[in-house]
Amino acid sequence: MISKIKKRLFGFGLYSVACLSLFAQKGGRAATPVYLDENKAIEQRVEDALSRMTLEEKVAMVHAQSNFSSAGCPRLGIPELWMSDGPHGVRAEVLWGNFDWANWTTDSCTAFPALTCLAASFNPDMAYAYGEAIGAEARYRKKDVLLAPGVNIYRSPLNGRNFEYMGEDPYLSATMVVPYIKGVQENGVAACVKHYALNNQEFNRHTTNVQLSDRALYEIYLPAFKAAVQEGGTWSIMGSYNLYQGQHACHNKRLLKDILRDEWGFDGVVVSDWGGVHNTEQAIHNGMDLEFGSWTNGLSAGTRNAYDNYFLAFPYLKLIKEGKVGTKELDEKVSNVLRLIFRTSMDPHKPFGSLGSPEHGQAGREIAEEGIVLLQNNGNVLPIDLNKAKKIAVIGENAIKMMTVGGGSSSLKVKYEISPLDGLKSRVGSKAEVVYARGYVGDPTGEYNGVKTGQDLKDNRSEDELLAEALQVAKDADYVVFFGGLNKSNHQDCEDSDRASLGLPYAQDRVISELAKVNKNLIVVNISGNAVAMPWVNEVPAIVQGWFLGSEAGTALASVLVGDANPSGKLPFTF
């Protein structure tokens, strides 16, 4: 018994000595560990934190723990990372294990113009304002990583996701991405530039094997990513779904190690696109840091937490414990993740952020106004002269349809969205009568992953009936403004599908041509993130490229149409 007591006392003594060793000589306070000392260099903090972590804690840090979060190290007080979709606004909160809306009442955001519109401004100051505002909204919502911006090159006008990118010019994309990143990261939020690399179509995006020359790779498809790393200092990059030279981009040695790390000196985190990892050993050795996915709710894959079955989770741990791989690569991955955490969630000086503020709405409006493009103005039909106009006819579903919901991962739940019709009515006021006719019926749905627009766009009238009403309204108007184009439905401007053709859907060409016959002051406003065919171009005097403009869409379009703002945008891709 005495022997056991001695052993216990000896053990307690060692514990006491260990505890006392953590106390500083000055003032009797506990010494701050290096990794928690904000006065130490980040690399020192990373090294110290890494040295304190167990193998299991390290592996837990390199894969998802929910749809939009990854683990920290609770034992050491290192917080988890939270991410959000957000090319054009911070996405609504979703449930832990799926993408359905979580039904919060505090997650309505400002919707900013699509990045095609930002690129059309050709104004780096607008890119900085965009990044600063969206970064502030992400920070307020306690997001550490904003999964944006997208800089994939506009290679085909049929790519359903072109609206999320910055056009076909590598130089323009490289110029605009840098201030966007700086604006976001000033808020203590990491920009995550995507999709690296060569993800230029949605059709078969998971299986397409891209083959191209090095000259095309370096001169066309990589400049924006290189600028993001070397000039913008982006803290994270998202891998893409496709393959490059037979190897998936999310664990492609040429892209992630040879170019990104060795040539460009990237020191941030490579995040997989959701479900983009396919091979544990390639992910270990070829530069993937943090695996995310969408194939599990975390609960229904047997007795283990299903997230532990990710390629960089339990399978990785098993390989290490069996001695089949070492821990050098793991330490590199965890170091990158720790560096990101110290830059974001553990930065004590990060701002508080703000959400849905008037200033953010104003920034969105200014970006929209600078990005709107005047494609044609024969006979100086524009701007609308409110001193002469008595009646303005507004035609087209896109005059009333909300465009912030839908389109894939960029779908938003907004604080407000001003439609083109409401914006024009508000600006015109009592100076003229504004009369609306629908003209055509597109996609009546108004829901995406549980986020609802609240609009009921069902209309059982035939195409002929809708057209007849539009012509009746238009024939005696002083101006006719047709708001048409694309929307965020599948096979239009939408993730995970490409367009079926270059033409306008819903028989809009017929409506436009018939309107041109009854009124010579016809203005067509094309709302899209893509080029469209315009077989009626010689019939219509005025054409405006209106993009997807976000919360202030209607206000910005009205300002341009009546001449309050100059349509100074330039096309970032070929029409």
Regions found by a protein language model. Name each.
Residues M1-A31:
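Bacterial Sec-dependent N-terminal signal peptides
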Residues L22-F575:
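Glycoside hydrolase catalytic-domain context in secreted enzymes
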